[in-house]
């Protein structure tokens, strides 16, 4: 079963890692590849040992094993590249979704600010209209009071 790197390992940029950290990172990410390399190396060493001892049959057997193990290693490498390539694509897609979500939040915030601004302008307009109406009523009241005084004076006379 493959081991997926933790978020702290994934966050660390490969350019910032040392050689040994990169080796450990990639071995954890694709454990079948180093296992295939080790088994292929073992098959080559056994084939060389059998060639030196003159045992052609076993040497041929181990060379065949080497070819099979190399093929398995390449398949694991390609499968891992495909898997992590699609995972990287998904991560980019998630980043794009996060950008779109942030943009949508920004648009909603702008709309909310515009709505509040419009509401404030309407309140100011209503307040101004109320002041004008109050001023009109005050002037009308003053006019009526003046008329009432005139009527009272004319009545007294």
From Swiss-Prot:
It is found in: Mitochondrion membrane. One of its GO terms (cellular component) is mitochondrial inner membrane. PROSITE patterns: HIG1. InterPro entries: Hypoxia_induced_domain (IPR007667), RCF1 (IPR050355). The chain crosses the membrane at residues 31-51, 67-87. Residues 120-135, 146-157 have a biased composition (Basic and acidic residues). It holds the Pfam family HIG_1_N. Residues 136-145 have a biased composition (Low complexity). One of its GO terms (biological process) is regulation of proton transport. Keywords: Coiled coil, Membrane, Mitochondrion, Transmembrane, Transmembrane helix. Signal peptide: none annotated. Residues 4-95 form the HIG1 domain. It comes from the Eukaryota. Residues 120-157 are annotated as: Disordered. Residues 87-157 form a coiled coil. It is a multi-pass membrane protein. The keyword Mitochondrion applies. Associates with the respiratory chain complex III/complex IV supercomplex. Belongs to the RCF1 family. Cytochrome c oxidase subunit which plays a role in assembly of respiratory supercomplexes. This is Respiratory supercomplex factor 1, mitochondrial. It comes from Eremothecium gossypii (strain ATCC 10895 / CBS 109.51 / FGSC 9923 / NRRL Y-1056) (Yeast). The lineage of its organism: Eukaryota, Fungi, Dikarya, Ascomycota, Saccharomycotina.
């Amino acid at each position: 079963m493959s081991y997926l790197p933790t978020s702290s390992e994934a966050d660390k940029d490969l350019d910032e890692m040392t050689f040994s950290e990169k080796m450990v990172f990639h071995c954890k990410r694709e454990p079948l590849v180093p296992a295939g390399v080790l088994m292929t190396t073992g098959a080559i060493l056994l084939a060389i040992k059998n060639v030196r001892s003159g045992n052609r049959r076993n040497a041929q057997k181990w060379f065949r094993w080497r070819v099979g193990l190399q093929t398995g290693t390449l398949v694991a490498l390609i499968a891992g590249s495909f898997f992590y390539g699609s995972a990287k694509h998904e991560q980019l897609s998630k980043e794009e979704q996060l950008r779109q979500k942030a943009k949508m939040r920004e648009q909603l915030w702008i709309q909310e600010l515009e709505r509040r601004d419009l509401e404030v302008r309407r309140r100011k307009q209503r307040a101004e209209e109320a002041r004008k109406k109050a001023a009109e009523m005050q002037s009308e009241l003053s006019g009526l009071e003046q008329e009432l005084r005139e009527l009272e004076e004319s009545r007294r006379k």
